[in-house]
Amino acid sequence: MNTVEKWGIFEVSLKGPSAGNPFTEQSVSATFRSKNEIVTVDGFYDGDGVYKVRFMPSFTGDYVYETVGSFPEAESAGDFTVTEPTGNNHGPVRIANTYHFAYEDTTPYYSVGTTCYAWAHQPEEVHKQTLEELDKGYFNKMRFCVFPKHYIHNFRDPETFPYEGTPVDNSNLTEENFSYFVDFSGNNWDFTRFNPEHFRRMERCIVELQERGIEADIIVMHPYDRWGFSVMNREQDDLYWNYVIARFSAYRNVWWSLANEYDLMRAKKLEDWEHYADLLCKKDPYNHMRSIHNCIPFYDHTRPWITHCSLQRQDLYRHVEYTTDYRTRYQKPIVWDEIAYEGNIDMGWGNISGQELTRRFWEASMRGGYAGHGETFMNPEDILWWSHGGKLHGESPARIRFLHEILTQTPGLGLKQGPGAFDETVAVPDEMIPVTGYEIHYYGFGRPSFRNFVKPAGENWRVEVIDTWNMTITDAGVHSGKFRIALPGHEYMAVRLTRV
């Protein structure tokens, strides 16, 4: 009998017709049954006369399935056994305690993400370099696009395109004649015929991230386009959405981002986004994380289909500092996926220091939110992590990994901003409000040489000094009552107090 792990993928492969246009003229689906669940999912055409249906079981035990479709060979049946998960298989990420995340097996998930918009579309050498960096454990979520990207530093064509056809000539593209807005002439696509190889590349990336314990935050649509993918009509969009959902939804580490900078996609209206969201909710039986990302105006994150807020800063100076306000407003996890990138390009969204990006991560985390990384350093190869992946050159990734280690030590699940002085941000466990025995006092760009603390008489508190930049934790002893803790007098320090 076939076996698969709980939250793994069971795939049924069927031979069928290849004549005509199987993407629009044929269909296949399957129903999977066990004593605990009954799930029906759509399949997809994978090219060369092969049709596939994928399923992610949520329980252990015996399953049976039946496939049906528009062609005789689509009718089949079978069974398989689902075994206990192993290794880093903790299931899909879910919302936990309103503002936080946990895997389905209840293991806490503290998001420390990064952005590599077009890494799935790069040559093999760049792809391998990206994986080598990810192996260092800096991040546990990556944002990336299904469609290729047209933007500065992104004039090369991708390795594959999502549709059959030919692209506009890019040989004369330069920074001098680059435009965000193009008329799409010169492209010749058949938007009813997918290129399965393009989507297999995406699936390879999803699996490679999964093997490393990294969530795949898939950006389904985006505005940076010279090929016409951002201005397809509703029928073409629906065909695309259904195909993507059928192919990707069974992977446990998938998150759905309906769009990156949705407000720049002028051809799409509010009713379009709500339509895509409705389709996604109906067709994804696993209820993966769902959001939509802004350039300037936030989407209405109170919408019930949105599981978490995927935010880009709206102000040059103040953004993650609003985390507590947005938690209160939206009653959902706050994920700052774009807060400017470490780098040195000419634009302000891509030239902050590693120290500043690390500070923003800490400010978001201490307020009960989460943040995202990106890197945009100029280099002779014109390979920038924010889009292509490749090699990391910045100083923040190791500090972000260190922060994640601190977050995983939180009692209970998740932090929240607690009461503190005007010149500090104090984080306490969300589950332990109002009485807590755990506090992190973060001083950001302040440079105190000492701090005074007052605790009730008779209570003992273990004190640790955290240097968030040099990544050290120094034991400062056990104290009670009123006491003073010496600090080195430089930025990015924190003091952790734990009642013992």
Report the location of each language-model feature.
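Aromatic- and carboxylate-lined catalytic core of secreted/periplasmic carbohydrate-active enzymes
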Residues: 2, 342-345, 357-477, 485-500
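Extracellular glycoside hydrolase catalytic/binding regions
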Residues: 239, 253, 260-395
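Non-catalytic, glycine-rich low-complexity segments
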Residues: 1-36, 41-44, 79-85, 423-426, ...
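Extended acidic/polar, glycine-enriched regions
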Residues: 37-98
